[in-house]
Amino acid sequence: MSRRGTAEKKTAKYDPIYRNRLVNMLVNRILKHGKKSLAYQIIYRAVKKIQQKTETNPLSVLRQAIRGVTPDITVKARRVGGSTHQVPVEIGSTQGKALAVRWLLAASRKRPGRDMAFKLSSELVDAAKGSGDAIRKKEETHRMAEANRAFAHFR
């Protein structure tokens, strides 16, 4: 065990235009090969497309989408007596948001089409409405946790 103290949590930074932490989380997750300016371009174009589609505040749509996709509980594999059980575990808000962002980006990458900004904006609008692949992933995770509720005492 480490003799040092626990490391303090890093506070998430804000993005330069919207001053929003969620936008920055999206930018950092969509980032590939260190091309952060390209990641910002994609996100900002997606936000503009959301504005055009819904004619409402795009950041509220983003917040609603992430709130809809954020899981309360997940399953972790745990070995007990030679067999592996899926043990349901509650997760914190920060970890839940990180999972939600990851699932939203994975779902938008799976969508047909070439333009990532368009795919991301479509997925975010769908998630805000309560449909889409990312919402399905959250429901599937919750179903798995419910099905394995008997193993909750292995925590």
Curated annotation (Swiss-Prot):
Keywords: Plastid, Ribonucleoprotein, Ribosomal protein, RNA-binding, rRNA-binding. GO terms for molecular function: rRNA binding; structural constituent of ribosome. GO terms for biological process: translation. One of its GO terms (cellular component) is small ribosomal subunit. Gene3D superfamilies: Ribosomal protein S7 domain. PROSITE patterns: RIBOSOMAL_S7. InterPro entries: Ribosomal_uS7, Ribosomal_uS7_bac/org-type, Ribosomal_uS7_CS, Ribosomal_uS7_dom, Ribosomal_uS7_dom_sf. Its main location: plastid. Belongs to the universal ribosomal protein uS7 family. One of the primary rRNA binding proteins, it binds directly to 16S rRNA where it nucleates assembly of the head domain of the 30S subunit. NCBIfam families: rpsG_bact. This is Small ribosomal subunit protein uS7cz/uS7cy. It comes from Cuscuta exaltata (Tall dodder).
